[in-house]
Amino acid sequence: MEHYPFKLHSEFEPQGDQPEAIQKIVNGVNEGKRHQTLLGATGTGKTFTMSNVIKQVGKPTLIIAHNKTLAGQLYSEFKEFFPENRVEYFVSYYDYYQPEAYVPSTDTFIEKDASINDEIDQLRHSATSALFERDDVIVIASVSCIYGLGNPEEYRDLVVSIRAGMEMDRSELLKKLVDVQYTRNDIDFRRGTFRVRGDVVEIFPASREEMCIRVEFFGDEIDRIREVNYLTGEVLRERDHFAIFPASHFVTREEKMKSAIQRIENELEERLAELNAENKLLEAQRLEQRTNYDLEMMREMGFCSGIENYSVHLTLRPMGSTPYTLLDYFGDDWLVMIDESHVTLPQIRGMYNGDRARKQVLVDHGFRLPSALDNRPLKFEEFEEKTKQLVYVSATPGPFELEHTDEMVQQIIRPTGLLDPKIEVRPTENQIDDLLGEIQDRIDRNERVLVTTLTKKMSEDLTIYLKEAGIKVNYLHSEIKTLERIEIIRDLRMGTYDVIVGINLLREGIDIPEVSLVVILDADKEGFLRSQRSLVQTIGRAARNSRGEVIMYGDKITDSMRYALDETERRRTIQEAYNEKHNITPTTINKKIHDVISATVENDETNEQQQTEVPKKMTKKEREKTIANIEKEMKQAAKDLDFEKATELRDMLFELKAEG
């Protein structure tokens, strides 16, 4: 394994309370602290702080986010901060995934159906191979990193290592490639395949995007190794050595495969005896037929559809033991950072039970062997055992972080000097007329307003009332498709609307600098949407504007409201003192309005991108043209590593195709 230091590229130096936060976390890691929490207010540069910690600590780092969009955003940011180091992306490679399931009440079996994103699969392979090649690796992952993966030792041991000048004939290399699940394809050359032309073998590694390896033989010796652009054939550079990692994470040696097949046959025999004893003849016949088909595929091809369900046998683990995951691909000394930990940790905790419930039904009705239950995500206790040092990052840490952290590392100061918003609590009497007056004030100043309610009916009624009063308003709710949701937020920023009304305005993408007023109706109704954390997060929506204010309507002050008021006031006091001491004037964040709604097409004459609005109703020809344009832009966004935009464009495609 090669050693490289982390090199952070940024035109900014840590400022405000960032230097102190960085030093505290670095000291904690060096002292061997297991749990640390960075309590960072919205907009204080938590990602930059995390980057500085990684640079100073110098350990391979896993950063876990709670969804693909957030992971993609972090990936783009860390790639910018560490262009000379290996920043990798590891999320579920399914664009669409329907797990196999059985509904006993209707006797319905749902086959597994999935669409695999080839680029994300390549990035997953890039991540695992990087962890074995270097120690300056940052992996940005979603919660899918706790799902089962192949044995890392087997994955590493089966690497095909080639050197210029080494003795190896062509047929020996081809056999080794087939053993690690590469397939020969002389026509359709793509990732995970190789092609043969005389004494030249070209291999397309599973972890690469555009580069393939050309191996030239002279008799029984490798004469030269070169990196080549697979499309143009251009030679990129000479290589003395190259390591070809397996094309699948579930790769198994031939002798192990034989042992695994024997174990599966033994388990099948035992399970059939159980089912027959219970007079479950249909289930027994179904299980025997399905399992024998899979076994035949394994003998002939070395793999089968759904091979992950036999992972406990393929890795020769005892039944019920902890599965291998991405966490096992890290060495002994590494760091975990959990972003938005108040959301991510509960997700990690809940994965096992949901997966278990679905698979148990499949096992009970003869669709799978009991060992399929061992192809699962980690239990939370197993996750804790596998991780040694964790840094939780959140503006509102949850109970787990509070319980396990001695002292919070706080980051309250914003580099822009922005303060937490002023909060005012007002009675509910005449609240709508009062709200109307406040909205009108903001419209006069060309500012925007967010209003959060507790119920769908309240949102709808309020939206109708405001429209009748002449306000440009729209309503955000869970039934609105991704395409429309992004369009509504963009239209708010552009001034098409002045107000957005919604129930839960905490989702990503609602940080809008133009918003100077956040209104919380029914603030005194305790519950999930009016809890301490929800209120603090909602208040944060007004923290991107120098005139940010929050109005809570309620007839009493609940414990959650009191906490949110006190916490915001505490932060404001710290921020004001810092600004006064350093003579800083708060300035509203200037955030570019990205065009994620329009498909862009390339103008041949000007070679510039122009916007093409997606019409509400389109002819079939127009729809096909729009779909082609969006697909083109989506692929370009993925190529530019702008996964957030690529994901949004993908969702637009799904919706346009569904409407067609």
Swiss-Prot record:
Binding annotation for ATP = 40-47
Where does this polypeptide localize?
Answer: Cytoplasm
What region holds the Helicase ATP-binding domain?
27-414
Q: What is its main location?
A: cytoplasm
Q: Which domain of life is it from?
A: Bacteria
User: What is the source species?
Assistant: Staphylococcus saprophyticus subsp. saprophyticus (strain ATCC 15305 / DSM 20229 / NCIMB 8711 / NCTC 7292 / S-41)
Has the keyword DNA repair been applied to this entry?
yes
> Does the entry annotate any disulfide bonds, and if so which pairs?
none
Beta-hairpin (motif): residue ranges: 93-116
**What is the protein's given name?**
UvrABC system protein B
The record's GO CC annotations read: cytoplasm; excinuclease repair complex
The GO biological-process annotations, alphabetized, read as: nucleotide-excision repair; SOS response
Q: What is the protein's quaternary organization?
A: Forms a heterotetramer with UvrA during the search for lesions. Interacts with UvrC in an incision complex.
Functional summary from the UniProt entry:
The UvrABC repair system catalyzes the recognition and processing of DNA lesions. A damage recognition complex composed of 2 UvrA and 2 UvrB subunits scans DNA for abnormalities. Upon binding of the UvrA(2)B(2) complex to a putative damaged site, the DNA wraps around one UvrB monomer. DNA wrap is dependent on ATP binding by UvrB and probably causes local melting of the DNA helix, facilitating insertion of UvrB beta-hairpin between the DNA strands. Then UvrB probes one DNA strand for the presence of a lesion.
Span of domain Helicase C-terminal: 431-593
SMART domains in the record: DEXDc (SM00487), HELICc (SM00490)
Positions of the region Disordered? Answer: 603-622
Family of this protein: Belongs to the UvrB family.
Question: Can you quote the domain comment?
Answer: The beta-hairpin motif is involved in DNA binding.
InterPro entries, per this entry?
A: Helicase/UvrB_N, Helicase_ATP-bd, Helicase_C-like, P-loop_NTPase, UVR_dom, UVR_dom_sf, UvrB, UvrB_inter
NCBIfam families given for it? Answer: PRK05298.1, uvrb
Stretches assigned to the UVR domain: 624-659
Gene name, per UniProt, is uvrB
